């Protein structure tokens, strides 16, 4: 225990002091601008979706509204008069402004706490003289790594990272990094007063995309802090269970994405793959015996060891969440399977190891004999059933996969409706371009195409056949995928038509930094 405490203190020696009054002063915005945290800096800047509008807000707008709240003694009236709580928004006459205020406050808080991580990240890159590799942020970059290493491993463990059941857990985690007590009290006050915080912390749906739009950035930061704490302890356990010790470990935050790097001895090292923070931070832990990867709230632990070793790590995780984070985690939520006999669902794909047997006849002089060879191949497949369930939740089809119309989009123009359906189809095909069998993906395209036709027919009070005949090739072209067009340029003879030809070619794109939204609904 003393060794663990010393490990914490050593890593957290850079605990950050924050100035609470900066939240309501101009200095914080000048500091953010000078440090390159605005649009031009591209370190933290993320366009903020204004509730109820299609336009984007700016840092100046955040400053203006927070200053306005401060001048109106907003917090004082919120605390003293709970029956007329402007912050929550239920009793305020203008619901838009109450939600908008909470959005601006959460943005201001996130800007403050992100600054030290940004400065640490910039100084690290300058110190190491390394260039940021945006390719490593791609979700697809993990699959070539798995394709290369999983062929020689035995067991895989599926882990669902539990959600914190109380906001105090997240505040206590931040308390380890932040010295400013008033700022922590402010965070507690904000979370208690915010009307939608229950939908994030206590929910039956395990998707973290239940955040409301106006505070998503703040909750992503809090969730990433929690996940980092989990993996911080996991690294500690891993370091003390390995014969080859790690030489250094650093973790950073870029925008709201955690970055990390480990430098090891010759036979082991750590690769960190980053994507859209909680739209999907992805880690890959590599050594000669164990591999760890996480995308969003799901992780896999793959090992060459025995089933007993995997059970050991399973109970390590259970004890970690039970005794350190103080909430119960059922051990049955961690599944241990043999790679050669089971597939696992990770990052939107069903992955498995396929064994192919081939026989070769060899002849030497007058003797001939047969040689049986067994090869193992890493295979990725589209989870068709999961995608259909996701489409049904998004009201594109029924649970059985029967396409239905999307009446909520009937207010758009015909070209707008076609463009939306086509964009969803292209994004799905782009993300699942690494599948070796794409017949299931063609079924998803068919559902979206027919749902688009039903939506247009319902808008004009006509039949589906009429619109299919009227649009013809135009509707079909909207559902051509970029991946198929790229593949047709690479292999023009193999693909005479985008929907026909070679459907076993796999393409991994290194520009995908977030998992598609339909998979997030699962």
UniProtKB/Swiss-Prot annotation:
Transmembrane residues, as ranges? none
List GO BP terms, alphabetically.
Answer: mRNA processing; RNA splicing; tRNA processing
Pfam families the UniProt entry points to: Intron_maturas2 (PF01348), MatK_N (PF01824)
Q: What is its main location?
A: plastid
Supply the alphabetized keyword list.
Answer: Chloroplast, mRNA processing, Plastid, RNA-binding, tRNA processing
Q: Please provide, alphabetically and separated by semicolons, the GO molecular function terms listed in this UniProt record.
A: RNA binding
**Localization, UniProt:** Plastid, Chloroplast
Q: Which GO terms describe its cellular component?
A: chloroplast
Family from the record: Belongs to the intron maturase 2 family. MatK subfamily.
Q: What is the stated purpose of this protein?
A: Usually encoded in the trnK tRNA gene intron. Probably assists in splicing its own and other chloroplast group II introns.
HAMAP family for this protein: MatK
Q: What is this protein called?
A: Maturase K
Q: Which gene encodes it?
A: matK
